[in-house]
């Protein structure tokens, strides 16, 4: 099982991501508005949110007039997402599925894999299978958007020496029971597989400051290099239209590879089906 398969994680997912993505290193301000604009621009023949989690993008789109489908590998994530949609009186199609082989039974003009969804595929075989599956689900000229980040050698070098119990504090949030929870993680990096793996530790505290629960949850992600992504896109029937750097409209100049050096934010790929 992975981090996102656990009931306790799914029920608090948006709570701790809201904190994480507002930290300086993980700035994701405006990400929902960003995907709404993409949906307005490219979603005329339907939108699907792949790796939708508990609905941060999917529900935001629906509340702003874009009714999309949603799918996630985690049944727990789908369950929480469906409950949140029902609480908002939103009638959405949400189903469990693996992005490498799910069949939605229809095609779309926009496929969204937001935030780190694509990076949870642990090897190139699954990445290729997923990209080809997204291609099959798109109408001619349809758009796939997904995220990667620039692997950073200094961080990689540090993580290559990380031991399973070398926990570092990540954040603190308030869970769905009103309890303070501190999150620590210990992430190691394997340069031969490009895999980041390790554990997230969740410590829950009572009102007196006593730790009353501790849970360890595993997580595995694969780093994908920028030029590797260009080759994967080409191999799977896509052309790179744009690479946004963050959610404020900044874009790389695709005719000048050195333009990428100006940014430290995530790469948000806009891929067009050939």
Label for each model-derived stretch:
Residues 1-45:
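Conserved class I S-adenosyl-L-methionine
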Residues 101-110:
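A short acidic, Gly/Pro-enriched loop at the edge of an enzyme's catalytic core
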Residues 109-125:
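A short SAM/SAH-binding and catalytic strip from SAM-dependent methyltransferases
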Residues 128-140:
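A short glycine-rich, Lys/Arg-flanked "PGG" loop and its adjoining helix->strand segment in the class I
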Residues 58-101:
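Class I SAM-dependent methyltransferase SAM/SAH-binding core
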Residues 51-55:
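Class I SAM-dependent methyltransferase "Motif I" SAM/SAH-binding loop
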